UniProtKB/Swiss-Prot annotation:
Residues 223-276 are annotated as: Disordered. One of its GO terms (biological process) is cytoplasmic translation. GO terms for cellular component: large ribosomal subunit. Keywords: Ribonucleoprotein, Ribosomal protein, RNA-binding, rRNA-binding. One of the primary rRNA binding proteins. Required for association of the 30S and 50S subunits to form the 70S ribosome, for tRNA binding and peptide bond formation. It has been suggested to have peptidyltransferase activity; this is somewhat controversial. Makes several contacts with the 16S rRNA in the 70S ribosome. This is Large ribosomal subunit protein uL2. The lineage of its organism: Bacteria, Thermotogati, Thermotogota, Thermotogae, Thermotogales. The gene is rplB. Belongs to the universal ribosomal protein uL2 family. The keyword Ribonucleoprotein applies.
Length: 276
């Protein structure tokens, strides 16, 4: 996969950098692995905005991804295609298992069409294979890591991300998260060996506001440009905030810690990300 740059024939093209999609081998998705996807516009079931700056965008269909893989332990799978997924930054790989079933997984870096992948405790340590953490050597880079055994991968699923196994002690493995946090994870949790593909995603530049709107994101308006009824920074003569910077709901921002204390998972965090 590479990046594509453009000549500045228009203002929107001047700084635009996008993927050349050279790693995509199949343009139409597998119909049996599609599901309808309803837009929320950032609203919850009460109809209230819970995520600002969301709405519009191109229509999408959800690709059903296998984040668990342990139920296919010992069954080899051949990579049929590498596909684009509009719902995530990573590419997805279409697998055909020896028993005839097709499934999507996150496409790891270095996995190509025709490769054979495996999951289970006895799988080989190579990119794309899924194993319990107890079977993966210390120092290995992994992605799609489970937090709870059997729940499916939740950590390191975005393009170019990974966790590193730092140590093992008792029933827990010590993992360095993409954020830099050191955290204990149960050794029975599954993880996929390797790094998530499409690493150049972080270097893409949209070039114009319209491309961002296609992705379903609306303009991010500054608080000082609003009226007092809409934001604590609103109103006044000129552009002054008048007080310490706050969020739209009045909480201090720029350094104020908002993480809820005494969470049950605190005992698994060895070192917080901001202590690195």
């Amino acid at each position: 996969m590479g990046l594509k740059r453009f000549k500045p024939v228009t203002p929107g093209r001047r700084f635009m950098v996008i993927s050349d999609f050279s790693d995509i081998t199949k343009t139409e998705p597998e119909k049996s692995l599609l599901a309808p996807l309803k837009k929320t516009g950032g609203r919850n079931h009460h109809g209230r905005v819970t995520v600002r700056h969301r709405g519009g965008g191109h229509k999408r269909r959800y690709r059903i991804i296998d984040f668990k893989r342990y139920d296919k332990a010992g069954i080899p799978a051949k990579v049929l295609a590498i596909e684009y997924d509009p719902n995530r930054s990573a590419r997805i790989a279409l697998l055909l298992y020896a028993d005839g079933e097709k499934r999507y997984i996150l496409a790891p870096k270095g996995v190509n069409v025709g490769d054979t992948l495996m999951s289970g405790p006895d799988a080989e340590i190579r990119p794309g294979n899924a194993l319990p953490l107890e079977k993966i050597p210390v120092g290995t880079l992994v992605h799609n890591v489970e937090f709870t055994p059997g729940k499916g991968g939740q950590i390191a699923r975005a393009a170019g991300t990974y966790c590193q196994i730092m140590a093992k002690e008792g029933n827990y493995a010590l993992l360095r998260m993409p954020s830099g946090e050191l955290r204990k994870v149960h050794i029975k949790c599954y993880a996929t060996v390797g790094v998530v593909g499409n690493e150049d995603h972080k270097n893409e530049v949209h070039g114009k506001a319209g491309r961002v709107r296609w992705l379903g994101r609306r303009p991010h308006v500054r608080g000082v440009a609003m009226n007092p009824v809409d934001h604590p920074h609103g109103g006044g003569e000129g552009r002054g905030k008048g007080h310490h910077p706050t969020s739209p709901w009045g909480l201090p921002t720029k350094g104020y810690k908002t993480r809820r204390g005494k969470r049950p998972s605190d005992k698994f965090i060895v070192r917080r990300r901001n202590e690195v």
